[in-house]
Amino acid sequence: MKLLKAIRDADALRPNQLSTPRKAEILMVLEHRIAEMMGAEAPTLKVSVEDDTASVEDMELLLPDGHNECYHLYLAAQLDAYNQDSALYSNDHAIANEAVADAMAWWRRENRKESKGNWKV
């Protein structure tokens, strides 16, 4: 999934006035968590988040297509927090965290280290 598509999907869920660079910065927080779990280098945002009129470079996000709902759910929850809508934030945050946990569990299952066969009981 691309960064700007995740932002567009979240905007469809929660119309808002937050600038695209700020939304990209919010998504980079999640992307850093995912990169740390994968042992990959976290991507960096190549735009100043202070400049609300700056255009954001589109980049490929780390999670594959089967788990890309994590991004727009996470961003929607953070938009609820920004708008101080605590009732929506609680629900959306729980749903987003569950989606992220499922994606991380899937990644760990698919990318296990080879077992050396040494078991101690």
List the predicted regions and their residue ranges.
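Conserved short "hinge" loops at termini or chain/domain junctions
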Residues: M1-M59, M104-V121
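Short loop/turn elements at secondary-structure junctions
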Residues: A12-P21, G66-N68, H72-V121
